[in-house]
Swiss-Prot record:
Cofactor binding remark: Binds 1 FAD per subunit.
Species annotation: Rickettsia bellii (strain OSU 85-389)
Cysteines joined through disulfide linkages: none
Cofactor names: FAD
UniProt xrefs under Gene3D superfamilies: FAD/NAD(P)-binding domain
The entry's keywords: FAD, Flavoprotein, NADP, Oxidoreductase
Protein name: Ferredoxin--NADP reductase
Length: 332
């Protein structure tokens, strides 16, 4: 059995920043994550995707952000339990005991759930032969941007991922078709402005009012994507690559058995300290929900700070926390 002050479930960007915040307050951390490496979706799904809303970084690749967060947390010697899930929860007096899928038991006074989307996988479009092209011509995630250099690409979707990747890949692709069933995209205003400018240049063609209909090709090599509008009109787009970005399936796994207040795959928390309905268990980042929640990495960072300052009194038996700025408290 391992003993620690704080158990963090999830080693994505918000979980990593929670390690730093706990360390600044003198609390030791163990961390559980289902992936083989730390970083969550930033590493597993889009390591090269540029992120624009991290303070002091006008633009930073997701993998580089994780590297910096890992360095920031490292002085506090977190213990990572990777490639395993949190399975069972028991309360023994003032302590929680969590058992992992590898039968490791971790005992702590506080649990911080920073599980992001939980266990995740892509929502795939219902195309008859799509599996034939997967990993050769059809990709749901991008972890090597350079492989799309000079390609003709269909990007399907209307959210941030579709818009941001269309903008990014327009720098290296030959031609991009951005296909969306509606005529409006759901993305940041600045991203929409950039998309409009690039579309006017001809590097991106907006194919709105259409949905994916079928694929044509041979031996895993895509030759064209057929799209269809509401009037049953079709267009053939001659492309090498299809990138469907229709979001992720979210599953919280065994967390649903922990008597937490869960609604629509999110954990309900109070909007001040982000504590769940179980005292001593907090939820932060994308997995947490409260009125007015913004799903931003930046928001998760703030939630990590507030929740761990509140957790200090639970770890140290009600002792008052004397607030100090990091400049006076910590010298690396």
């Amino acid at each position: 059995m391992h003993n620690t002050d704080v158990l963090i479930i999830g080693a994505g960007p918000v979980g990593l920043f929670a390690i730093f915040q706990a360390g600044m307050l003198g609390m030791k951390c163990h961390v559980i994550d289902a992936q083989e490496v730390i970083g969550g979706q930033c590493i597993t799904l889009y390591p090269e995707k540029p992120i624009y809303d991290i303070p002091a970084y006008p633009k930073i690749a997701a993998a580089d952000l994780i590297k910096q967060l890992e360095l920031q947390a490292a002085p506090f010697n977190p213990v990572y339990h990777l490639n395993q899930q949190a399975v069972e929860l028991k309360k023994e007096g003032e302590f929680f005991e969590v058992k992992t899928s590898k039968d490791i038991v971790i005992k702590s006074k506080v649990i911080v759930i920073a599980a992001g989307a939980g266990s995740f996988g892509p929502n795939k479009p219902p195309l008859a032969n799509i599996e034939e092209f997967e990993n050769e011509s059809v990709f749901y995630f991008i972890n090597n941007r350079s492989k799309f250099t000079g390609k003709n690409i269909v990007i399907a979707g209307g959210g941030d991922s579709a818009v941001d990747w269309a903008i990014s890949l327009s720098e290296i692709a030959n031609k991009i078709y951005l296909v969306h069933r509606r005529d409006k995209f759901r993305a940041a205003n600045e991203s929409l402005r950039q998309l409009k400018d690039i579309a006017e240049s001809g590097k991106i063609e907006l194919v709105t009012g259409y949905q994916l209909d079928s694929l044509e090709g041979n031996n895993s090599e895509l030759q064209s994507v057929i799209v269809r509008d509401l009037q049953n009109n079709t267009r053939k787009l001659n492309v090498n690559i299809l990138l469907p970005f229709f979001g992720l399936k979210q599953e919280l796994g065994n967390l649903v058995n922990w008597d937490l207040d869960i609604k629509l795959h999110h954990i309900e928390v109070d909007p001040v300290y982000y504590q769940t309905n179980i005292s001593g268990i907090y939820a932060i980042g994308d997995v947490a929900h409260y009125s007015g929640k913004l799903k931003l990495i930046l928001t998760g960072f703030a939630e990590a700070a507030s929740s761990l300052h509140h957790a200090y009194g639970k770890v140290f038996d009600g002792n008052a926390l004397h607030f100090e700025y990091s400049t006076t408290k910590y010298t690396q």
